[in-house]
Amino acid sequence: MSEADRCGAEIVPVDSEHSAIFQCLQGCVDRREIRRLILTCSGGPFRGMGRDEVGRMTKADALRHPNWTMGPKITVDCSTLMNKGLEVIEAMRLYRLPLAQVSVMVHPQSIVHSMVEFKDGAVLAQLGTPDMRLPIRYAMTYPARGENPAPPLDLLNSPPLTFLEPDRETFPCLRLAEEAAEAGGTACAILNGANEEAVRLFLAEKIGFYDISDLVAAARATVLVTQTPSLEEILSADHAAREAVKSAFARRHS
């Protein structure tokens, strides 16, 4: 971000939620007018389930996302809500806001891609079909808006829009990501490295669903956080987190 500032460059995000926020902020000349950013998520394939039921879910279950078609790793991240936690960190960095001003809401229909609430009480939202061609095309043609091959949103035949509070007890990865965001420094690198290694084990069907969050939490508790790190220290934290997950897995299966 500092390099973009130095060069006078504008970062146009491609991720659908951050693209939505970027679009909602067009015309906002003073970021102090923002009360909070609201990132939406579908809730994944296990939305509405309790811990016992979620704990029995398998790789095949986790890969059945209700609204989006994605690769296996990010689909698992959506099922644990880790993907939304990483997007919270991304939003904090992109828009330079503290965690207290970045919220998450479960929105099962995946039509509202994110919102911005302003201090005067107004809330701006960006709506569209759940199709990545929309934010990608917007980023490529910005500031113009060209024709898009994605189907347009049919509001008259769309389902009612609903919003729910995320369940951080059933989906602890969201809480772990928020805690890493608050901790700062290399905490986010530790979180990400540990999660990637844990999801790799889950996709290999070597661990269960809740082992993902348990292994990530173990790595966060084991690997020391460095504030204002160098690139080398960030890479070292990532490596240490992955090794911590491998070691924890080996101990459990020795």
Ranges and model annotations:
Residues 1-254:
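Catalytic, metal-anchored helix/loop core of enzyme active sites in primary metabolism
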